[in-house]
Regions:
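Conserved beta-strand-loop-beta-strand hairpin that lines the nucleotide-binding pocket
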Residues: 2-22, 27-41, 89-199
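Charged, alpha-helix-enriched surfaces in structured cytosolic catalytic cores
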Residues: 49, 70, 164
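STAS-typified acidic loop motif
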Residues: 38-52
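Conserved short strand/loop->alpha-helix "switch" segment adjacent to the catalytic nucleotide/phosphoryl-transfer site
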Residues: 56-80, 153-159
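Functionally constrained cores in energy, signaling, and assembly domains
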Residues: 79-82, 115
C-alpha cells in the first residue's frame, strides 16, 4: 500500500465527495418500488470491525429480495472481498482513515456490488492491471490460477498475479469485473469496482 501527499484540508471532504458520487451513480429513472433497486448503501470510513455489520445488513436486504440461499452466499462473498480490497489497498489519509462507498443493487442482469474509494495512483494502476488480467481468463484458468497462488503464495510483483480475494471474486461473478479509475489528482484517484453476480 502506498501513501502520498495531499492537501490536508481536502481530507475532510473525502467522505462528502463519496456521498455525492453515490447519489449520482445510480441509473437514471430507476423506480423506487418493484423488484429492482438499491438494497444497501454505505458511505463513510471503513475498518475491519465494520465488515461484519455491513454483511449483516446486506444479508437482511438480500433475504427480502427473494434470492436463493446459494445466490445470497455468492453475493455476500463478493461483498466481503470488495470491502477487504479497499481495506488492503485504499488510500489512507493522515488521520489513518479510508473512505469507502458501497452499494448492493438488484438489477435485471443480477445483483451488482459497487465499491468506490480513493487509491494512490500507482496502486490504482496495479489493481487495474490485475483486474484486466483476471477478466481475460475463463473459469478453468481462474481455478488454476487460484490453486497456483494458494500453493505458491502471493507474489504481487509478478505481472498478472492477483490476490486470492480478487481471483475468488472473479470466479463467483461469472462475468467481467468492471474497474473505472478517474484521472488522478495530487497522486490520488477515485476508483470504482463493480461485480455482477448473475442468477
Amino acid at each position: 500500500m502506498h501513501t502520498c501527499k495531499m492537501d490536508h484540508s481536502k481530507h475532510t471532504e473525502l467522505v462528502p465527495m463519496l456521498q455525492q458520487r453515490l447519489r449520482s451513480s445510480g441509473p437514471e429513472g430507476t423506480p423506487l418500488g418493484g423488484r429492482y433497486g438499491i438494497l444497501l448503501s454505505f458511505t463513510g470510513t471503513v475498518e475491519r470491525d465494520i465488515v461484519p455489520h455491513l454483511l449483516q445488513l446486506a444479508e437482511r436486504s438480500l433475504a427480502t429480495s427473494g434470492c436463493s440461499r446459494k445466490e445470497m452466499k455468492r453475493v455476500l462473498f463478493v461483498t466481503i472481498e470488495a470491502v477487504q480490497n479497499v481495506i488492503h489497498h485504499g488510500y489512507i489519509d493522515p488521520s489513518g482513515d479510508i473512505a469507502l462507498y458501497l452499494t448492493l443493487e438488484n438489477t435485471p442482469i443480477g445483483f451488482q456490488v459497487h465499491c468506490g474509494n480513493w487509491m494512490a495512483t500507482s496502486d490504482a494502476a496495479a489493481l487495474s492491471e490485475r483486474v484486466s488480467h483476471l477478466n481475460s481468463l475463463n473459469h478453468a484458468q481462474l481455478r488454476k490460477l487460484y490453486i497456483d497462488v494458494l500453493c505458491n503464495g502471493e507474489q504481487s510483483g509478478n505481472q498478472g498475479n492477483a490476490g486470492l480475494g480478487l481471483i475468488s471474486m472473479a470466479k463467483r461473478t461469472r462475468g467481467p469485473i468492471e474497474f473505472v479509475a478517474e484521472p488522478p489528482k495530487d497522486g490520488v484517484q477515485h476508483v470504482t469496482l463493480t461485480a455482477t453476480i448473475e442468477p
